[in-house]
Amino acid sequence: MRTAYWVMVMMMVGITAPLSEGRKLNDAIRGLVADYLTPQLLQSLVSAPYPEFQLDDPNLEIPVCIWKVCPPIPWRRRDLKKRNK
């Protein structure tokens, strides 16, 4: 959580500092994005198919954690719902 907070703070500083120098907002935001990130690359990332989870599958693989934040495991959600009934 701390990492996400500092990333957010640094992005806000990276956007607001150039604005105080008289630059436009679009230019400040574009300065945060890598040059090789094109609309075609973004489209291919967004349209990539995601595997469907089968909760009863014994060979279900746990998703990889990204940025030290792991998504909740699907079968834990189901177990929590059963306990709350």
From Swiss-Prot:
Q: Which UniProt keywords apply?
A: Cleavage on pair of basic residues, Disulfide bond, G-protein coupled receptor impairing toxin, Neurotoxin, Secreted, Signal, Toxin
Q: Which GO terms describe its cellular component?
A: extracellular region
Propeptide found at 23-60, 76-85
Gene Ontology terms, MF aspect = toxin activity
Signal peptide from the UniProt entry? 1-22
Tissue-wise expression: Expressed by the venom duct.
Cell compartment(s), UniProt: Secreted
Family assignment? Belongs to the conotoxin C superfamily.
What name does UniProt use for this protein?
Contulakin-Lt1
User: According to the entry, what is the taxonomic lineage of the organism?
Assistant: Eukaryota, Metazoa, Spiralia, Lophotrochozoa, Mollusca
